[in-house]
Amino acid sequence: MMDRKQTAETLLTLSPAEVANLKEGINFFRNKTTGKEYILYKEKDHLKACKNLCKHQGGLFMKDIEDLDGRSVKCTKHNWKLDVSTMKYINPPGSFCQDELVIEMDENNGLSLVELNPPNPWDSDPRSPEELAFGEVQITYLTHACMDLKLGDKRMVFDPWLIGPAFARGWWLLHEPPSDWLERLCKADLIYISHMHSDHLSYPTLKQLSQRRPDIPIYVGDTERPVFWNLDQSGVGLTNINVVPFGIWQQVDKSLRFMILMDGVHPEMDTCIIVEYKGHKILNTVDCTRPNGGRLPEKVALMMSDFAGGASGFPMTFSGGKFTEEWKAQFIKAERRKLLNYKAQLVKDLQPRIYCPFAGYFVESHPSDKYIKETNTKNDPNQLNNLIRKNSDVVTWTPRPGAVLDLGRMLKDPTDSKGIVEPPEGTKIYKDSWDFGPYLEILNSAVRDEIFCHSSWIKEYFTWAGFKNYNLVVRMIETDEDFSPFPGGYDYLVDFLDLSFPKERPSREHPYEEIHSRVDVIRYVVKNGLLWDDLYIGFQTRLLRDPDIYHHLFWNHFQIKLPLTPPNWKSFLMHCD
């Protein structure tokens, strides 16, 4: 069978009026063009959807008159029952899970049901697992999301962030990487970088690597915004970046192949990967919220995923209204618990032989971010692993820098004392110094840039950014380290309805946001045309909004959709007043 590129297919659309008329519980729909049937389940603000097609023998479901809770449907062929609230079959129990469809809402509150096609691309050209020799497949944890995989005589590395900060100056490594990390990277046959966030695509790390091996093969997914969109400007001399389509096996040698999958159903930014060696699959979902639209291979040899939470400025950087310290603490506690339970349930459903929580080992270590560090609590990987073991037979691994998992040993006998070799006694596990100076000086250099001697940079920048025709007024305030107004800094309004820069807020009714930004970071971002993730995910802002509404189109534009080339400041300086 020929491999074909994975694409997203819209199965059903509902108008805003149809969405507003959805009743609590079960709703049946038919696509009049295709004749296909679908089920939507509504519980307050939460929606779930699936095909109206029984997994047993393809029968249609109808309302189950015996169901008093309004959650289950019954197949017209053999009376199989599906609980649509959980997407699990309850008669016979423990038989199947129904595949969920992805629900996408547009800005007008219309709805689309979307499915990836093919949904399970890893099933193309299936291979039976072969027995692994001891030492044949070894996984070494380096730090955060970086793993060093020995796969026969090949070496593959995931997401190398080994030095410097991520998100401007907001994230720093929690774990001390092994001292030979650069030698390990240089020996790799290939590197996978999941997405463009700087805790995965670390230009300081790659700069050191490129000085030794500029031609090292690096593989990324074919995302809407290229992963290496900023490579030329970064000054990092990598020459062998390979962009591969989603859902197609990439053959490395006769025993080793990998497949990159998208997050959700639209390949804007995030990806995940399946690595297969001699029929044994390693699934790395990285930071994906809904990897491959929620369809993932079951019973893989090893699964790894994020777990920690806290990768957002919400709610720590917000103030006003409900955003009291008590509210923030309760919200964070509830969100971390939800994430923990979701990850535990996902692992229980997928039943990998081994599970490893990673990609969450960062810390807000700069002294100016003490408040964020204390407020932004993270999930404990051991707590997640305990929860997984309590509810399943999955073997778990909480990694420490330099620890090595021998997959052949662990698959044969999970109790083998040599299956996981911990780092030697006395190995430094946690970082206690981060060399802030050089990285902060790079940011600080932007503060003194000639661009900012001319107030017309504001119009130049936001015209370049290209976001307009949206009823939102934003006040941008440059601040010092402590978020007090920066002496001589800029404080201005942007009206995105007509992209004007008024002296006062307009008289019409309008949503309003105040964004207080550390001057070194906002000016560095503006000068270099960088995405606002450095500001928001990096905790470099303090925000106030009235009303308390998340403006998705605004934030999505500045976090993902800015132009690929920076503003032409050279031309600006030649022509500005």
From Swiss-Prot:
Q: Does the keyword Transcription regulation apply?
A: no
Q: What is its main location?
A: cytoplasm
Q: What class of enzyme is it?
A: oxidoreductase
> Which PANTHER family does the entry link to?
CYTIDINE MONOPHOSPHATE-N-ACETYLNEURAMINIC ACID HYDROXYLASE, INACTIVE CYTIDINE MONOPHOSPHATE-N-ACETYLNEURAMINIC ACID HYDROXYLASE
What is this protein identified as? Cytidine monophosphate-N-acetylneuraminic acid hydroxylase
Q: Where in the cell is it found?
A: Cytoplasm
Q: List the disulfide bonds.
A: none
Q: Which GO CC terms are listed, alphabetically?
A: cytoplasm; endoplasmic reticulum
Name its species: Mus musculus
Family indicated by similarity = Belongs to the CMP-Neu5Ac hydroxylase family.
Traits of the deletion mutant: Mice do not synthesize N-glycolylneuraminic acid (Neu5Gc).
The pathway to which it is assigned is: Amino-sugar metabolism; N-acetylneuraminate metabolism
Which reaction(s) does its UniProt entry say it catalyses?
Answer: CMP-N-acetyl-beta-neuraminate + 2 Fe(II)-[cytochrome b5] + O2 + 2 H(+) = CMP-N-glycoloyl-beta-neuraminate + 2 Fe(III)-[cytochrome b5] + H2O
Name the cofactor(s) required for activity, per the record: [2Fe-2S] cluster
